[in-house]
From Swiss-Prot:
Compositional bias annotation for Low complexity: 80-89, 184-237, 248-257
Protein name: Translation initiation factor IF-2
Positions of the UniProt region annotated as G3: 474-477
Stretch list, region Disordered: 1-296
Gene designation: infB
Family assignment from sequence similarity: Belongs to the TRAFAC class translation factor GTPase superfamily. Classic translation factor GTPase family. IF-2 subfamily.
Length: 921
């Protein structure tokens, strides 16, 4: 270019010849060898870019240094000339004339704008510094990640290189071991001219630009044979040439040459990176018989467009080699967490461990136990096997399905006060239900059969002063209802012991005291019937001292209140004492959780189905909840209060009737709400299974010990009175069964074929017919079809409303099965004076009656020398050849015995009568 440019000369000078870039392509020809002596000449083109001196691979990017944001540059100078500001704050123009004076507002606005600008400047600077710091951290993390990836890549390449080296050594060793014919000859000293490929750089920085096209091309395999070096039927042990070499990379450009037998071959790169000289071309010679074996014919070789496919035999040999390597490789042991129940079969245990059942059985055999895969082993043995095989064990039990149902600890911050639960207990006819009626302003006594309580009931009463609700549970006082009283004491907070002032402490009063002590709940004594003229409350307090109940008036800590249910005297004070005791107990619970409760009573209602009276103790029971109680489950269809109102939910200490069970649960079962039906089915199936196992164990256990065998021998001849019992509620049925069980003796006992809740059905009649049993209905009736079937088959059905009438009738019927008692009544004695032998009659003894009377047909004993030699009946009694009915003392008569004639003079005959006396239980 000239030193000076002419402004008007803009013409571009173009040389006479167009400039072009010469393609840097290196070409050459190589000969590619194929199995079975075939070869092909190909042309290889190598394209790439030349490296300039000083070029190098770009260095890895470095994280920039954290930059500190600089303050923005000052604003450009104003076009107006800047002059000194006048002292008066006036701005002057170019001529020095004051244009306008700034007001105070404008000056304050300008100062505020400057302050805001400084704040923004500081904020932007801080954000820039934060962004620079984050960018530096991010780039440092990326750099560390790249370095780790590069290290992994290098390790992977090194591993692949070692694997290829080991594989190549193994193939060479196999070639030496299994090769046939002469050894390969050394390569010629003067190799054929080939296209020399540049050696591969060790690392990426030495690689030229355009790396994908600049790698050395590998056409032949590393073990390409020199001419005639391999036997006719042998193949090289290295990789096949058609695969592009061991690295599996295709050549940059391969074109088939016109002549397949001429031309040089490419230099092959070894695993270490150094170039090896290509072997000399194959020499053409006449193949011998061994060279010809296993090769293609000339026509097939000339007509083939591609290399020959792999033979089946070669594929099989390779498969066998791979199988051998796989067998030699030790598999990694899989350690599993094995869940072991209480009992498990060997096959199932092996499946859970992913082991062979044969190995498990072999392990058991080493321990001296012979088993089959279908045998059941216990959890301890299964745990030993699993740990021996290197697995971890998780022991589970069938009872785990009940975990989390009850007694879940609540957070103290979620609790709130609840109403107290009070159980009223006492002896029969001491006024428990009447006292509750007076508190509830109701009349339950008139609804009970016989005026006695035979059901457990739960009610809620509101205290008049505080307005708090108190839940009362009324229990029967009769001896037959012990289980009911015990159940009431378990779910209660306070026990109110009702004692009649005119009757004092009675047996069921003592039992109620024991129940309260066993439940460890406080007690309040209500001395009832103080309105009677013969009431003596002081005697009641004194009698309670004998049973370790010391009231406050006698220096104790038990509260006592004198009340009258008839006149409603001191009822307010009784409620006040109950509320005071509840405040002392500080009763709290969590209502915002799934409900828990206790089944107080259960029955089978004909119109509503199974109905259970439930006392909710924790949480809230809602309509639609899935509930479990004992071996029964269901979904809550309705909640009915003690007043008959339908509720949507019931909180703690609220008694409700629950509808929706599949069957009536047993009284005393705990109720819980579960999350779904699947969990409910698991719990109920487990409990039903436990109940069946317990029943089977009780039956099989009766044959266990020697004492049980002796008791069975005693009861082997015991008579049984079969019964089918149906009751209205579970509690009454429980009381009936307990009372009938007490009636049994060693000679006779009641056999309960079936006991259930609900009306009498046809199936009950059919069952009773099969065992010739009686049917008893307590507060229930048989339906029309069952009554007709019982009448047709002669099955007796008896109905009762009072439990004592039922027990008395069954007792009388069972007494009829007892064997009667035989009692002897002495009539008289006679002495034999002479023995006569009469032809048609036999021997007849002539006797004199010494005392009493001898009657014909009475029982006699023949005594000889104070030893009884015969017992029988008197068949003939005559006096002077006349048959007489009896003979008095001092008279003589003739006697003959039935089927006996060995009578001697001097023998004594005792005459007695046997009386049959009917026994009773």
């Amino acid at each position: 270019m000239a030193d000076q440019n002419t402004p008007g000369d803009k013409k571009l000078g173009v040389p006479s010849k167009t400039l072009t870039l010469k393609p840097r392509v290196e070409t050459g020809t190589v000969r590619q060898s194929f199995p079975h002596g075939r070869s092909k000449q190909v042309v290889v083109e190598k394209r790439g870019t030349k490296r300039r001196v000083g070029d190098g691979a770009p260095d890895a990017p470095h994280a920039p240094e954290p930059t500190v944001a600089k303050a923005p540059p000052p604003p450009p100078p104003s076009n107006r000339p800047s002059g000194p500001r006048p002292s008066g704050g006036q701005q002057r123009g170019g001529s020095g004339v004051v244009l306008r004076t700034l007001t105070e507002d404008e000056r304050s606005a300008r100062a505020s704008a400057l302050a805001d600008a400084r704040v923004r400047d500081l904020e932007e600077r801080r954000q820039a510094e934060e962004e620079a710091r984050r960018r530096a951290e991010r780039e440092a993390a990326e750099r560390a990640e790249r370095e780790a990836a590069e290290a992994r890549r290098k390790a992977e390449e090194e591993r692949h290189r070692h694997e290829e080296e080991a594989k190549r050594k193994a193939e060479l060793e196999a070639k030496k071991r299994f090769g046939e014919g002469e050894a390969p000859r050394p390569a010629a000293a003067a190799p054929q001219p080939t296209v020399s490929a540049p050696a591969r750089p060790a690392q990426a920085p030495g690689r030229p630009q355009g790396a994908p096209g600049s790698r050395p091309q590998q056409i032949g395999g590393p073990s390409s044979r020199p001419g005639g070096s391999q036997p006719g039927g042998a193949r090289p042990a290295g990789p096949r040439p058609a695969g592009g070499g061991p690295l599996g990379r295709a050549p940059a450009a391969v074109a088939a040459g016109p002549d397949e037998d001429e031309g040089p071959r490419q230099i092959r790169r070894g695993p270490g990176g150094a170039a090896r000289p290509a072997p000399p071309p194959k020499t053409t010679h006449k193949p011998g018989p061994q060279k010809q074996r296993g090769r293609l014919t000339v026509v097939t070789a000339l007509n083939a467009d591609d290399v020959r496919e792999r033979s089946i035999a070669s594929f099989r040999r390779r498969t066998q080699r791979l199988k051998g390597h796989a067998a030699n490789e030790q598999k990694e042991k899989l350690v599993r967490e094995v869940t072991i129940p209480e009992a498990i079969t060997i096959q199932e245990l092996a499946n859970r461990m992913s082991e062979r059942a044969v190995d498990v059985i072999r392990l058991l055999m080493r321990q001296g136990a012979m088993h089959k895969i279908t045998d059941v082993i216990d959890a301890d043995t299964a745990q030993l096997i699993a740990e021996e095989l290197g697995h971890t064990v998780k022991r589970v039990a069938a009872s785990d399905v009940e975990e989390g149902l009850f007694d879940v600890v609540d957070d103290s911050t979620d609790t709130e006060p609840r109403s107290p639960v009070v159980t009223v207990m006492g002896h029969v006819d001491h006024g428990k239900t009447s006292l509750l009626d007076a508190l509830r302003h109701a009349n339950v006594v008139s609804g009970e059969a016989g005026g006695i309580t035979q059901h457990i009931g739960a009610y809620q009463v509101t205290a008049p002063d505080s307005g708090k609700k108190i839940t009362f549970i009324d229990t029967p006082g009769h001896a037959a209802f012990t289980a009911m009283r015990a159940r009431g004491a378990k779910v209660t907070d306070i026990v109110v012991l009702v004692v009649a002032a005119d009757d004092g402490v009675m047996p069921q009063t003592i039992e109620a005291i024991n129940h309260a002590k066993a439940a460890k709940v406080p007690m309040i004594v209500a001395i009832n019937k103080i309105d009677k003229p013969d009431a003596r409350p002081e005697r009641v307090r004194t009698e309670l001292l004998q049973h370790e109940v010391q009231v406050e008036s006698l220096g104790g800590d038990v509260v006592d209140v004198e009340v009258s249910a008839k006149n409603k005297t001191n009822l307010d004070r009784l409620l006040e004492m109950i509320a005071l005791q509840a405040d002392i107990l500080d009763l709290k619970t969590n209502s915002d959780r799934p409900a828990e409760g206790t089944v107080i009573e259960a029955k089978l209602d004909r119109g509503r189905g199974p109905v259970a009276t439930v006392l909710v103790q924790r949480g809230t029971l809602r309509v639609g909840d899935i509930i479990v109680a004992g071996a029964e489950m269901g979904r809550v269809r309705a909640l009915i209060s003690d007043q008959g109102e339908t509720l949507q939910e019931a909180g703690p200490s609220v008694p409700v009737e629950v509808l929706g069970f599949n069957g009536p649960p047993e009284a005393g079962d705990r109720l819980a709400v579960v999350e779904n039906e699947a969990r409910a089915r698991q719990v109920t199936s487990y409990r039903a299974h436990q109940k069946r196992e317990n029943a089977a164990a009780s039956i099989s256990g009766m044959r266990g010990s020697l004492e049980q065998m002796m008791s069975q021998l005693k009861t082997a001849g015991r008579k049984e009175f079969p019964l089918v019992i149906k009751a209205d509620v579970q509690g009454s049925l429980e009381a009936i069964l307990g009372s009938l069980e007490k009636l049994g003796t060693e000679e006779v006992a009641a056999r309960i074929l079936h006991a259930g809740v609900g009306g009498i059905s046809e199936s009950d009649v059919t069952l009773a017919e099969g065992f010739n049993a009686a049917i008893i209905g307590f507060s229930v009736r048989a339906n029309k079809e069952a009554a007709a079937l019982a009448k047709r088959n002669g099955i007796e059905i008896r109905y009762y409303n009072i439990i004592y009438d039922l027990v008395d009738d069954v007792k009388k019927a069972m007494s009829g099965l007892l064997a009667p008692t035989l009692r002897e009544t002495m009539l008289g004695n006679a002495q034999i004076l002479e023995v006569f032998n009469i032809s048609k009659v036999g021997k007849v003894a002539g006797c004199r009656v010494t005392d009493g009377t001898v009657e014909r047909g009475a029982n006699v004993r023949l005594i000889r020398d104070n030893v009884v030699v015969h017992e029988g009946k008197l068949s003939t009694l005559k006096r002077f050849k006349d048959e007489v009915k009896d003979v008095q003392a001092g008279q003589e008569c003739g006697m003959a015995f039935e089927n006996y004639g060995d009578m001697r003079v001097g023998d004594v005959i005792e005459c007695y009568r046997v009386e049959t006396i009917q026994r009773s239980l």
